[in-house]
């Protein structure tokens, strides 16, 4: 009987690790990677050397695309994890795409707008502990206003 109980526990543990733990750990690793890419390339603008701009655009778009893939194809465990911790993967992907506009040199993006976009990424990924509460509140208000405007346009 003890052997059977051990087998059942082992199967349940394997299922928990494989179907819950593994996707959540992968998401957390991707989250850290995305934050690293955003920190590294958020200040790159049209005045940077071409190879730096190309690397920034590529890295930011790849990070945004991978987050969007997580957002669209996530498991129930990842969905629950994002809900509990307040992650907004779609908003984070949009912020990364916004940061990529600076190095593309299609338009001049002021440093304040880039900083707000980076801060929105921090808020979307639950990494805003280093920001003052006033900044977090202001960014959250901007996010709500942007989502409301987008909903109004699409309606």
Question: For the regions a protein language model found, what residue spans apply to each?
Answer:
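Conserved non-transmembrane functional hotspots
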Residues: 17-155
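Membrane-embedded hydrophobic alpha-helical segments
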Residues: 1-21
């Amino acid at each position: 009987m003890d052997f059977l109980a051990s087998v059942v526990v082992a199967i349940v543990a394997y299922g928990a690790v494989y179907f819950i733990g593994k996707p959540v750990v992968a998401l957390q690793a991707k989250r850290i990677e995305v934050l690293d890419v955003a920190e590294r390339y958020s200040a790159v603008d049209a005045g940077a050397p071409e190879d730096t701009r190309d690397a920034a655009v590529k890295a930011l778009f790849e990070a945004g695309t991978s987050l969007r893939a997580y957002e669209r194809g996530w498991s129930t465990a990842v969905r629950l994890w994002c809900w509990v911790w307040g992650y907004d993967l779609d908003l984070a992907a949009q912020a990364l795409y916004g940061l990529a506009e600076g190095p593309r040199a299609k338009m001049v993006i002021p440093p304040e707008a880039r900083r707000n976009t980076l801060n929105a990424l921090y808020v979307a990924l639950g990494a805003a502990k280093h920001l003052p509460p006033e900044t977090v509140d202001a960014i959250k208000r901007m996010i709500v206003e942007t989502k409301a405007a987008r909903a109004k346009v699409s309606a």
